[in-house]
Curated annotation (Swiss-Prot):
Entry function: Part of the bacABCDEF operon responsible for the biosynthesis of the nonribosomally synthesized dipeptide antibiotic bacilysin, composed of L-alanine and L-anticapsin. Bacilysin is an irreversible inactivator of the glutaminase domain of glucosamine synthetase. BacB catalyzes the allylic isomerization of the endocyclic-delta(4),delta(8)-7R-dihydro-hydroxyphenylpyruvate (en-H2HPP) to generate a mixture of 3E,7R- and 3Z, 7R-olefins of the exocyclic-delta(3),delta(5)-dihydro-hydroxyphenylpyruvate (ex-H2HPP).
Co-factor binding comment: Binds 2 Fe(2+) or Co(2+) ions per subunit.
Protein name listed in UniProt: H2HPP isomerase
A Pfam family this chain is assigned to: Cupin_2
Pathway: Antibiotic biosynthesis; bacilysin biosynthesis
Residues annotated for substrate binding in this entry: 223
Primary localisation category: cytoplasm
Subcellular location(s) per record: Cytoplasm
Residues that hold a divalent metal cation 1 according to the record: 50, 52, 56, 91
Organism: Bacillus amyloliquefaciens (Bacillus velezensis)
Length: 236
C-alpha cells in the first residue's frame, strides 16, 4: 500500500538538478514515459544541436531564445509559440540576449503514439478564450498533444474537481495555487510540476490575492479535438 509520501512523489515528483558544462541548469521531473525539464539558459549560451529517440516539445517562459529544429530557426519569445522536435530530429538553441532565459521542455516516448509536427516544427497560438468565468486560457494544438496556458484568478479562483480520459501534465509558471490529485494536495509554486494519468481525479484552487499562471499539457488534445482531427486527416 502506497504511503502519502509515495503518492506525492508519484503525482508531484521531486525534481532532480542537472548541470551542464555550458552553465545550463535543468530541473527534471519524471513520471512513466514523460520527463518535464525546467531549463535555465545563461546569457549568450549555445545549446548544441542534438537528437534522441524521444519527441520533445517546449516553449519559453521568460526571455527570448533562438530555437533551431531541423533546418528551421525561429526566435521564441515568452509564451508566444511552441516547438515540436520529433524523434531523431536534431534541435538546439542559443540565448543571444543579456538575460537568462527560462524554458520548459518535455520529452516523451510512449508506445502507440505517433509524433507529428508542422512542416516548420513550430506551433503558433491556436486560440484564446475563457474556459470558465475569469479563467482565460490559450491553446497550442497538434494532433497528439495540446498545450494550454491558464490563468487562475486570485481569491478563490478554481478549476473544479474532475477527471477525463486524457493524460495531463502541468507546471506552475506564475503565482501559486493548491493542486490536488486523488486526494494528494501540494502547494504549487514556480516550477512545480504535476503528472495526472487518465481518470485520476484532480482540481485546483488559488487562495492567493494574485492570479496564478500554469502550463498544462494534454495527451491527446482535450479541448480542441476537432482541430486535432483535421490535422490528422490532413496528414493522412
Amino acid at each position: 500500500m502506497k504511503t502519502k509520501q509515495d503518492l506525492q512523489e508519484l503525482y508531484f515528483p521531486t525534481p532532480k538538478l542537472i548541470e551542464w558544462e555550458n552553465g545550463v541548469r535543468q530541473y527534471s521531473s519524471v513520471r512513466g514515459d514523460t520527463e518535464v525539464l525546467l531549463s535555465y539558459v545563461p546569457p549568450h549560451t549555445n545549446v548544441e544541436p542534438h537528437q534522441h529517440k524521444e519527441v520533445q516539445i517546449g516553449l519559453v517562459v521568460s526571455g527570448e531564445l533562438s530555437m533551431t529544429v531541423g533546418d528551421v530557426t525561429r526566435k521564441m519569445t515568452a509564451l508566444e509559440s511552441a516547438y515540436i522536435a520529433p524523434p531523431y530530429v536534431p534541435h538546439g538553441a542559443r540565448n543571444e540576449t543579456d538575460q537568462e532565459v527560462i524554458a520548459i521542455d518535455i520529452k516523451r516516448l510512449k508506445a502507440g503514439e505517433t509524433y507529428t509536427s508542422p512542416e516548420d516544427y513550430f506551433l503558433n497560438i491556436f486560440k484564446t478564450r475563457d474556459l470558465l468565468p475569469g479563467m482565460e486560457v490559450t491553446f497550442f494544438v497538434e494532433d497528439w498533444v495540446e498545450i494550454m496556458l491558464a490563468n487562475i484568478p486570485g481569491n478563490g479562483g478554481e478549476m473544479p474537481f474532475h477527471k477525463h480520459r486524457n493524460e495531463q501534465i502541468g507546471i506552475c509558471i506564475g503565482g501559486g495555487y493548491d493542486m490536488t490529485i486523488e486526494g494528494c494536495k501540494v502547494d504549487m509554486t514556480f516550477g512545480t510540476a504535476y503528472f495526472c494519468d487518465p481518470r485520476e481525479d484532480h482540481g485546483a484552487i488559488n487562495r492567493f490575492e494574485k492570479d496564478s499562471k500554469s502550463v498544462n499539457i494534454f495527451f491527446p488534445p482535450r479541448y480542441n479535438r476537432a482541430k486535432a482531427k483535421k490535422l490528422e486527416a490532413k496528414e493522412s
